[in-house]
Curated annotation (Swiss-Prot):
Keywords: Cytoplasm, Queuosine biosynthesis, S-adenosyl-L-methionine, Transferase. Its EC number is 2.4.99.17. The gene is queA. This is S-adenosylmethionine:tRNA ribosyltransferase-isomerase. Transfers and isomerizes the ribose moiety from AdoMet to the 7-aminomethyl group of 7-deazaguanine (preQ1-tRNA) to give epoxyqueuosine (oQ-tRNA). It comes from Paraburkholderia phymatum (strain DSM 17167 / CIP 108236 / LMG 21445 / STM815).
Amino acid sequence: MFTLSDFDFDLPPELIAQTALPERSASRLLEVNGQTTPASFADRRFAELPECIQPGDLLVFNDTKVLKARFLGQKASGGKIEVLVERLTGERTALAQIRASKSPGPGTVLRLADAFDVTVGERVEPFYTLHFPDDCLTLIEQFGRLPLPPYIEHDPDAFDETRYQTVYAQNPGAVAAPTAGLHFDDSIFARLDAKGVERATLTLHVGAGTFQPVRVENIAEHKMHSEWYQLPQSLVDRIAATRARGNRVIAVGTTSMRALEAAARDADAAGKPLAATSAETDIFITPGYKFRVVDRLVTNFHLPKSTLLMLVSAFAGIETIRAAYRHAIDGRYRFFSYGDAMLLTRSEDALNA
């Protein structure tokens, strides 16, 4: 039904945020009301988010922590390589992307960061297995570089190491930040708590596939990358309690939404209620998808033709999102990972909204 071109738009390059603002909650927030015709918008500061949420509503955060997953290195022959660790698979093993003039075969030794050697193991398309000489996480955090998105043009510095990480990051494993969470700081949490807004966390380790472009015009043919996630029982209980009192579940970021909806979809398919789970998901949310859990979404502005733009269009309505993005561009909002945020409400008729 939909093609890639349906999710394209022209973005002035100067609106791509290259650095984070000095204060997390100083970013802007576009509150979108898709229930009106046409959609209406409120231009806010992110610090005003607590005013947009009701007591008893539940905010769901992704507590993944970004790894220093990028390495420059070389082969024994001297050939230069670049490694991006995608996923930790054991204490001393990981899956990684490797950029090299020639694909390394099993047994190839690579020198990373001029500090330690790894050995290439079996190929697990599109990744390579890497065997580390010691604890992966320790070596990655000591010698790796922060994997900033490809559209950010500067090398990571100490400011990025703080600001490309949420203040509540707990579980190391992501190679990209759950960026909607970057706007939250202690002052916002204090005001949310004072208002009686509930908070809970899940974990989804964001993979590098989040930046992979869609290369097929028929989006139904797109092959979605897979990511690991975990929903704890405490979150399942909080969602049930939120529903019981008539409040709303608000996902902070598309990664939180994907984890919640993947778990609910799989539970539905098995004829069971939502339950605690730890699993892989390659859920691909496009217009026409039936949302089961999430009522509202805090999210940043996404790339043209991206799967995340398709997701927000499925959630809030295609025309609503198009209008919101036009409003944001005209209003000089900042886009992508270090950019501003929007607050969306689920449309019951997203195909026509």
